[in-house]
Amino acid sequence: MFADFRTEEPDALARRLETATLPDSVFDLLAQTAARHPDAPAWRFIDDGVERSWGEVLAKVETAAAAFAALGIGPGVHVAVMAWNREEFPIAWLALSRLQAVMVPVNATYTSREVEYVLKTSLAAFLILEAEFLPHLDALETVSLPPSSVIVIGDGALGGHRRWQTLMDEAQGRRAPSTPRSADAVLNLQYTSGTTGFSKACMLTNDYWLCLGCSSTEFFATDLRRFYVGSSFFYMVGQRILLNAMVSGGCAFFPRKPGAKRFMLDVAQLECDYCALFEMVYKQPARPSDAHNALKLATIFAFGPESHADFQRRFDVYGQEFYGMTEIGGGTYMPAHRIAEMTGSASCGVVAPFRDAMIADEDGNPVPTGATGELCVRGRGLLKSYFGNEEATAQAFRKGWFRTGDLARVDSSGYHYILGRTKDMVRRSGENISAREVEVVLRTLDGIQDAAIVPVPDDYRGEEIKAYIQLAPGVDPSTCTPARIADHCGRHLAAFKVPRYYEYRDSFPLTDSQRVQKKHLLAEKPDLRVGAYDWQDKIWR
């Protein structure tokens, strides 16, 4: 297993980065990379067969910026982009940074209703989309974009829309007017995954991306050159990994449609030395070839103690825990040279550069070391606000601190531990129970693929605990019984944390970031006890 990491301590790394001079924009970072590595491979779009050097990428971005400027796209103009992973997507992003305009990434899996919501709430003046998504335009009811404001990638019925390739051909040899660039200019309206209510548009500046890209590249503490982008570019992870490649002068490899089944096959075939690996990949059936890869490091997110160690054995690579969210970018990270000793600790690491963190009580005051509270973050480059939503912005910030909504604790050495969501709790007989804590225990039982904990109203205890169980392929309730599950919980949890109700499911509704959408589970039936096994009364309800 690779372990040749630099040993710079977190405080020293933070001082070095926070006193460094960063570029004025993401485009300027690209220009610097192209100047240093003009002929080095920049990206490869695996399924399209498209490869570019950094010099070629810069030239294409300049052409796109000239084409956009001719349409009237300039500082502050909102441009929605809806596509799978193809090179026009990052070209558009970088060109918009060149013009100080704003990209609104649109999830390619969205329904017409969701597309309309994004276009309406973002006030998008232009839309760039792949031809396959044109039918969404016919379904719009409350949003109307002039055909001349729609740019179509690929072939398809245009109906007055502009064609991407035609615009690029016409702009060859031209340059957009010079635009003063500021790191404080908004570059993205990045929609959250919407775990509660409608998605909110986070106003993310160029500085947000520069702080995230530069610091996360330093977290790796080793020289990486081949970055697998196993995430769609409309998600922030895909954009962040491109910045990692840019900062390091490496190459980013994009599958058109990322997926858990192809993930490790791609990584091995392409000899990638870095990836950000979601737990859905780990949950794929193990292959004898899993460890046959060139990975030096993988970023992971909220792996349980046992799965973290098993992941490292299975894929023969260290998994570096990272805590972040759309609003804050990076919050904490595990120093690479500490991964081995901290594996199995369930810690997400220490505070990231450009960030301060506080564990706060309900009144916003810091709690003692080791006590549980809400993780709050402040620092350079956080979201400016939720676009068009002053109420949500006011609720998210308190005394200058962004409230993550995550319950956490920090130990005496500064290592942080995420315990659950502030609203993802069950209050049973006066005890606050973290749903995530119970879910982690459930997932360690052989035969359980995934689990979700929700509260059930109860006249006597206030709330009872219900466990939704998704069994692994080939396992059925006759072998993984409620009794076996409850016994397992009883051996790993205090009695008041053991679920009372158990219901089996074939699958879970998931958010964009692969989190269970518990609001849908809660809304499925008026009485959540129906269809569940009652462990206390030993009956099916």
Where are these regions (language model features)?
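AMP-binding/adenylate-forming catalytic core of the ANL superfamily
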Residues: 110-116, 127-129, 267, 275, ...
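Conserved AMP-binding/adenylate-forming core of the ANL superfamily
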Residues: 42-86, 90-94, 111-116, 165-166, ...
